[in-house]
Swiss-Prot record:
Glycans are attached at N97, N127, N231, N421, N508, N694, N778, N795. InterPro entries: ITI_HC_C (IPR010600), ITIH (IPR050934), VIT (IPR013694), VWF_A (IPR002035), vWFA_dom_sf (IPR036465). CDD domains: vWA_interalpha_trypsin_inhibitor. The keyword Transmembrane helix does not apply. Residues 207-227 are annotated as: Disordered. This is Inter-alpha-trypsin inhibitor heavy chain H5. It comes from Bos taurus. May act as a tumor suppressor. Gene3D superfamilies: von Willebrand factor, type A domain.
Amino acid sequence: MLPLLGLCFALPLCAGLLEEARSWEDTSDQVGLRIPRQVRLLQRLKTKPLMTEFSVKSTIISRYAFTTVACRMLNRGSEDQEVTFQMQIPAAAFITNFTALIGDKVYQGEITEREKRNGDKVKEKRNKTIEDNGEKGTETFRASAVLPSKDKAAFLLSYEELLQRRLGKYEHVVSVRPQQLVGRLTVEVTVLERPGIAELEVLGLQNSRQRGSGRGPDDSGPPPSTVINQNETFAKVVFKPSVVQQAKIAQNGILGDFIVRYDVNREQSIGDIQVLDGYFVHYFAPKDLPPLPKNVVFVLDSSASMVGTKLRQTKDALFTILHDLRPQDHFNIVGFSNRIKVWKDHLVSVTPNSIRDGKVYIHHMSPSGGTDINGALQRGIQLLNDYVAHNDIEDRSVSLVVFLTDGKPTVGETHTFKILNNTREATRGRVCIFTVGIGADVDFKLLEKLSLENCGLTRRVHEDHDARAQLIGFYDEIRTPLLSDIRVDYPPSLVERATRTLFPNYFNGSEIVIAGKLVDRAMDRLHVEVTASNSKKFVVLKKDVPVEPRKVGIDVSQSPRPRGRGQEEPNHLERLWSYLTLKELLSAWLQSIEEPERERLRQEAQALAVNHHFLIPFTSMTLKSAPRTEAPEAAYGMSSTSMATGPETVMQSLRGTHLQPGPAVKKPYNPRIKISKTSADGDPHFVVDFPLSNLTVCFNIDGEPGHILRLVSDHADSGVTVNGELIGAPAPPNGHKKQRTYFRTITILVNKPERSYLEITPSRVIVDGGDRLVLPCNQSAVVGRRGLEVSVSANASVTISIQGTVAFVVLLHLYKKPAPYQRNHLGFYIANGQGLSSNCHGLLGQFLNQEARLIGLSKSPAHPPVPEAGERSEAVLEVKGRQVPVVWKQRRIYNGEEQVDCWFARNNAAGLIDGEYKGYLAAHPFDSETAFGPGLSQGL
């Protein structure tokens, strides 16, 4: 019997679109009735299920966020209990996967087409258990299961979203509400932005449903235990509070929203265009332009339901908003209940007197009567149309209605279809309507359609202490229009399936995003043309953008389903394109009137969502039991010895239903591969073997903690890149160094025959090739897929074999009781480099196919003279036409098991390596675009 009691999905679409969520099993008829007193007694004696771990990991690449939530629970009681996993997700996000591990059974979510009920249309109502806070809010995902006594469960949820730029910032919000104190709680947010991260801030935990106006910096600072590591293009934020720190924030486990805000560097031209594997995205966000004049009518609900806090906070917000109007703007105010009351019979210019009089009018508004939404909108739009028609306006301007209500139409025209039709005919595409719904009783679906059909936005504002700030924040998003009538054109012969390219307005601090597919992946340039209207002129921007499909940073594959033969590995730009396309199809379906058109849009969205594994109102998710396995936790990246071993051993991302436990993890064995001398180990000490010259050379690299060194770079030919990240440690007493550095992470990017990522630390190995698998280093295991094999020898080494022609060995240096100057670290050895090309580069890779010789040395260079006490043996090494002074040394490798005689090059291998040491620094762990010395470059 499937033990899941119920599963509620919060689908990321406008209010009114979600079909009632389904439960996989109804067990209500199986629960025996008890005497009420007996129930209360049993509840008192029950031991609540313990959450042993709550982990959220997000990776944001080019504003597109992949998030995976992992939760582990333990039933400590003596009887079966129901456990519930609950997570708030952004309303704009799409769920891509859900997996439950109950005991030794695995249940995996599968996205399929949702059948139309009664053969007509999707029900336009929401499950009452789903919290819907509108476009800027959250929806809650819930899953329940019966967990046997003393057994363990794990839930894993994945979702994706495109971050929207508002008020000049991108905001990524993670809900941290495990409902109890958790022994292992981790939130990890990684940001990768090719243009560079302009600024990044972590706000204090917030429990308000919406977050104020955004005016001025948040001075609360990041929550305790937050660690931020950042360079120009990469940032990693980790929040890992202890139980004591959690209790100081909230003893009930409802910590709040963990918020990361950032922006990116921008070029003042056509915008930022990124290309990857036949897909492109175009970000356009100009600034430093003169603002367009606004013609704005504020239409405010003053019906009886607005009495009290709602009307008071609305008035306070409008007082601030009126002060922000510019001298070139014009405005008017309409109050409505069952009667329509207009402040002036025409729009007035912004002056100190008009602002004062407008505030007085708002102050005297009092709640009474019903709600005539249709009449109020018609009057507001008429005021704008009359102003534009009867005034000779020299400058271009934008006409806006800001409409605010807390209820449903109760007076005048109350039929939704007629209100929408009347509004559409009145605006005629020349007036944009921005709607705000206050409180829980508002007809949010109507407001959303009004905005969608009339080039506006909609927000839901909650009736709480910060409603005033929410209103001001919404107005701030539209207070500064910079461009109108924006059109973006690409050559039709080069681009297909582009998303929306026409935009009525562009507001300061926002961003226009377009994604599409390229007809020819081999093209080297893309012509882009942007036309728009500014306050006094018509703007035309043209540019031929170089298309460099391999220079976009890393590609985090999110393949949600088994790929057939010939299918390429999906990439984040393909996911972004499908996400935007789905959003536009769903919006078009919402606005469509004709049933044939609605059915066409439904089928197109449904096919795209199933193909890319997105949960939308036209698809459904069913849980299917995966094949039984001896160690299902290990197959999903979890420790089989303990369900509370930490987030490091949890599978970080579910990429689809094709990950099945069993075949991926084989019986462990101890690999026996002969390791060459060519290596980077210790502090870090580099050893290079020149087999063609029967010579060994060594050198040191004095890096800084956090530096990422390029070790092997053959991305263009064999498709292999290896980077190593350094960690710092104090030097031993009486040493000549102030600090030492070691490798704490080795990352390997394999691009052929298909893309795979490996991340190796002393505690875990992450293998990500569409299926993401996490292997603990304290357990032996072997995994393999399509030419890539990874073997873990417990607490000793990790061996990576690629296509049978390339092999690397990573040694694990672990300390049971480390001294202050000791750190667990890694050593990297090239076991087999036959499959690497002659163009291979990097600190180690550049020497694999080179010859070297010693000049003026009579004895065999392979066996340097053993110097007598106090004597130094020196020589000159010739490599690549360069002569480098070297001195004879001895090095220990393979955990000190073997001693190597080598010729040592000083000064960070100056003259030995191409260029300088700094040319080998990577921007992020999976970066494959780094210059190596003067004029040398290897790119993605």
